[in-house]
Amino acid sequence: MDRAVFYLRIFPGSEAEYDRRHAEIWPELVDEIRESGLRNFSGFRRGTDVWYYTEAGLDVATALAVHGPKPANQRWNRYFRDVIAQITDDSGELLWYDEVFHSGGPPLDGPFERALFGLVIDPDRADDYEALHANPWPDLMEAIEASGFRNYTGFRRGAHVVYYGEFYPDMTTVFAKMAAHEVNDRWGAAFEGIITTITDADGNLLAADEVYHQD
């Protein structure tokens, strides 16, 4: 299973319209997304910044390449020409984030919340950030699983990192449980000087609101 995140930016003032159009997308577009092999496809918006998390059986890039020329998708893209300000780089590639961390865990029953939040690192310490996540401590991984994180995955693009997760029963409860584990403080201390921004002025995580989901 391949996991991926890409980014887009919408025009200021178009936030409500972007959300409205995604509240109920066209049935023919839903069919095309499924035919292309994309699964667990979720969009999250914070202001004019939007991130999409998705999965595919082989690889997401191939599935999106299959999806791109489909007729409903072409009409959908044109429909957003006055809403989306940027979705590709100068070469025409989507603005991908690279996966740097993943935690799975056995399936859990009951309700859960899909969520995405971001943080900023010192770009000069990007190698240190990735090295720590390439070999996470066993007791950290145990605490993550025990706290109710599932499919918890980090992605980086430059100095910006986003985390997607499925939180049982919700993100607030899961992070409160995680904070009770001693390893959480040690892990946080390891990133002093690496992570420069992780909360807003009120101390809240920089979370984005889910505006779209398709299984």
Q: What do these predicted regions represent?
A:
Residues 18, 53, 62-64, 129, ...:
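Short acidic, gly/pro-rich beta-turn/loop elements at beta-sheet edges
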Residues 88-107, 199-215:
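Short, low-order "capping/linker" segments at domain edges
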Residues 14-38, 125-150:
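Short amphipathic alpha-helical segments
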Residues 32, 36-39, 57-93, 147, ...:
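An amphipathic, aromatic/His-enriched active-site/gating alpha helix that lines ligand/cofactor pockets
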Residues 30-59, 141-170:
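Short, glycine- and small/hydrophobic-rich beta-strand elements in well-ordered beta-sheets
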Residues 18, 26, 44, 76, ...:
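Tyrosine-centered aromatic motifs in long, intrinsically disordered, low-complexity repeat arrays
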Residues 2-16, 112-127:
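Short glycine-/aliphatic-rich beta-strand segments at the starts of folded cytosolic domains
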